[in-house]
């Protein structure tokens, strides 16, 4: 099968935005106009083509980035729909990694919103060229020029309109094209056949002003155009388009278009802008990788180079099983052939290759450089792995994923759920690198951790729907520790002698605090054999075994020293078991003399917020028993660094989101253990029924 679309006529783009700016609706319209859908699905009716998980249709948000293929004016456009919720930033990161360009969708009433800032920063990190689509021009309060202003103020982006709206809110009827200098009016409801007319007289001055600004901005990026501009020569529309394309590809310029996807206006000109200004696979730099011998190498977008690709998403599909989405960077791949997973060192067979159209799929026999497709039949491949030619191996740069920040305990409701839960958690962890499931050695609970409360809610919900596993989700648990603050000499004596073979073990041990992080240290200071040498390891083992159960509330004892300096033994009745028990009794007796305390994990927290929220956020950190450790300005945001007890960080993501209208982001990781205030320690001991793990 010959290549249907040349590399130059291929576009891999993402649609990115704040939650509710209308990304999914925009993608829907693209699919409608490019002839892939015959009936338009509305998101708020829960019938959208891109949102194909039940939860997405219920909640009206996009969780998984579905990749879909469309055709427009002789070009192939592969579109990845990305989620706009903070908890799903990993989905955005992984889709940006395999895109060449993106359309940033703004809400005309709000302009740049918090999640837009986050996604925009991620796109800048990956050097992704962007076109901006100001959507919802029909909405009450829609203001195109205000929205363009927010691009400058909040993102410091060199963004300029290449269109202006004709009217706004319910009078929005078309757009002015600042390159062709004409007007497009939409007569019918589906926006299929816009009419080209003269620019209305009352908007002529505004159009001239913005055309002038556009020409000047483009000329600034290109010396030849600058010379023409300064000499007062006319810049042709071909030169203008070439200048915009060059600036956009270099991520120095962002063309802005407008419309309303919901009312079917302005979507086709936006698609034209995608073809005109966003890169083909041949316009982006070659991808770098490492060869088996450690040498660096590049792979270019070319069918004749060795096959190389990156798996960017794994999903379980109800019909075909496990689907691995991948982006081909070089070479070609036939279905039924073998490839090497060079990241894992495994050979994989590609059963079938599917080109995805939201939730319907088309089987193809070959994929070419620059394509995005899904493979069926890969067993060991996970997100971020490289798939390549067996003979010409290479490992491409992988993706980095953030560490999970929230953890909750989960338990199956019945025995039948127990077995299925393990499989379900393993499958979900395979699909999502920021989700972890593990068993807590101390409590025996299954703990799941992820990027936020919504993230975990949705995963538990998916267990129920897709894997039919019913589970109870507990409150998040904190792993406390215990230690000693004072030194003391303590006796431990275990004697049982009631006829026949008895038990006799007797030790004197000096306990005391050790340096933080040094753990448990045991010293043998016995002189003259008062405790025979063969029983010394038993004393140490007895202490180590008892440490796990603590002396106050059953939490492990850490950072203590124990020096065995005296004791006695019995020729017949002493044995290892007796000395083990004597040592653990000594440790328990130390609880009365060594001033034991409870320690809690302290998290290093970094909060990034717009300046106006600084006072509230600092106050909130203090109310959570946190200590502010430092502050700095980063761009137009403030960064607060603090240490906060983990026990007081639950629910923080939700608090921060509502307290800053979603504009604040935070990261936290474990830093050190610190003593719990007395009043809280008493509550913890009470909740655990004192040392509830005696004997």
From Swiss-Prot:
Principal location: cytoplasm
Gene3D superfamilies from the UniProt entry: 3.30.230.10, 3.30.70.240, Elongation Factor G (Translational Gtpase), domain 3, P-loop containing nucleotide triphosphate hydrolases, Translation factors
Compartmental location: Cytoplasm
One Pfam family in the UniProt entry: GTP_EFTU
tr-type G domain: residues covered: 8-282
Any one GO BP annotation for this protein: ribosome disassembly
Origin: domain of life: Bacteria
GO molecular function: GTP binding; GTPase activity; translation elongation factor activity
Family: Belongs to the TRAFAC class translation factor GTPase superfamily. Classic translation factor GTPase family. EF-G/EF-2 subfamily.
Stated name of the protein: Elongation factor G
Record gene name: fusA
């Amino acid at each position: 099968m010959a290549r249907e679309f040349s590399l130059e006529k291929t576009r891999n783009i993402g649609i990115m935005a704040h939650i509710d700016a209308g990304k999914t609706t925009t993608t829907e319209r693209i699919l409608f106009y490019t002839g892939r859908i015959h009936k338009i699905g509305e998101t708020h009716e829960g019938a959208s083509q891109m949102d194909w998980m039940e939860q997405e249709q219920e909640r009206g948000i996009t969780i998984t980035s579905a990749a879909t293929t469309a055709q427009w004016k002789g070009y192939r456009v592969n579109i990845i729909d990305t989620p706009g919720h903070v908890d799903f930033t990993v989905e955005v990161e992984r889709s940006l990694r395999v895109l060449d360009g993106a359309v940033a969708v703004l809400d005309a009433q709000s302009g740049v919103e918090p999640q837009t800032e986050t996604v925009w920063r991620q796109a800048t990190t990956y050097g992704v060229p962007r076109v901006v689509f100001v959507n919802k021009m029909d909405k009450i309060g829609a203001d195109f020029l205000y929205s363009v202003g927010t691009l400058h103020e909040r993102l410091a982006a060199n963004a300029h309109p290449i269109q202006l709206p004709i009217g706004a809110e319910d009078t929005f009827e078309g757009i002015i094209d600042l390159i062709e200098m004409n007007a497009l009016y939409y007569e019918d409801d589906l926006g299929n056949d816009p009419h080209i007319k003269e620019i209305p007289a009352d908007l002529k001055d505004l159009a001239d002003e913005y055309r002038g600004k556009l020409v000047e901005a483009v000329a600034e990026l290109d010396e030849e155009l600058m010379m023409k501009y300064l000499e007062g020569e006319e810049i042709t529309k071909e030169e203008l388009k070439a200048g915009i394309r060059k600036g956009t590809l270099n991520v120095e310029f962002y063309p802005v278009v407008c419309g309303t996807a919901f009312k079917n206006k302005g979507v086709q000109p936006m698609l034209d802008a995608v073809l005109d200004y966003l890169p083909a696979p041949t316009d982006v730099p070659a991808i770098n990788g490492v060869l088996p011998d450690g040498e660096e190498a590049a792979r270019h977008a070319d069918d004749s180079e060795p096959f190389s690709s990156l798996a960017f998403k794994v999903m379980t599909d109800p019909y075909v099983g496990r689907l691995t989405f991948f982006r081909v960077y070089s070479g070609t791949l036939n279905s039924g052939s073998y490839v090497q997973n060079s990241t894992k060192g495994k050979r994989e067979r590609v059963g079938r290759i599917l080109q995805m159209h939201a939730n319907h799929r088309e089987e193809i026999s070959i994929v070419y450089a620059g394509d995005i497709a899904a493979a069926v039949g890969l067993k060991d491949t996970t997100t971020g792995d490289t798939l390549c030619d067996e003979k010409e191996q290479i490992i491409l740069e992988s993706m980095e994923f953030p560490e999970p920040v929230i953890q909750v305990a989960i338990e199956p409701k019945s025995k039948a759920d127990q077995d299925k839960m393990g499989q379900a958690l393993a499958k979900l962890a395979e699909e999502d690198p920021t989700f972890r499931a593990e068993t807590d050695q101390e409590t025996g609970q299954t703990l799941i951790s992820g990027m936020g409360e919504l993230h975990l809610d949705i995963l538990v919900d998916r267990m129920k729907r897709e894997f039919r596993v019913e589970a109870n989700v507990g409150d998040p648990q904190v792993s406390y520790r215990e230690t000693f603050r004072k030194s003391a000499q303590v006796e431990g004596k275990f004697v049982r002698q009631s006829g026949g073979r008895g038990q006799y073990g007797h030790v004197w041990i000096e306990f005391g605090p050790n340096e933080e992080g040094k753990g448990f240290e045991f010293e043998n200071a016995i002189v003259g054999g008062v405790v025979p040498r063969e029983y010394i390891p038993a004393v140490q083992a007895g202490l180590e075994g008892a440490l796990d159960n603590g002396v106050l509330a059953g939490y492990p004892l850490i950072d203590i020293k124990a020096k065995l300096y005296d004791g006695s033994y019995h020729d017949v009745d002493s044995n290892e078991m007796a000395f083990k028990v004597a040592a653990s009794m000594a440790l328990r007796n130390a609880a009365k003399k060594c001033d034991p305390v409870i320690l809690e994990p302290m998290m290093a927290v970094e909060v990034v917020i717009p300046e106006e929220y600084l006072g509230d956020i600092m106050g909130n950190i203090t109310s959570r028993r946190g200590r502010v450790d430092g502050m700095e300005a980063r761009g137009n945001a403030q960064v607060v660094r603090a240490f906060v007890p983990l026990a007081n960080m639950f629910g923080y993501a939700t608090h921060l989101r509502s307290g800053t209208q979603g504009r604040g982001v935070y990261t936290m990781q474990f830093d050190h253990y610190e003593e719990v205030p007395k009043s809280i320690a008493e509550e913890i001991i009470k909740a655990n029924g004192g040392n509830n793990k005696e004997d």
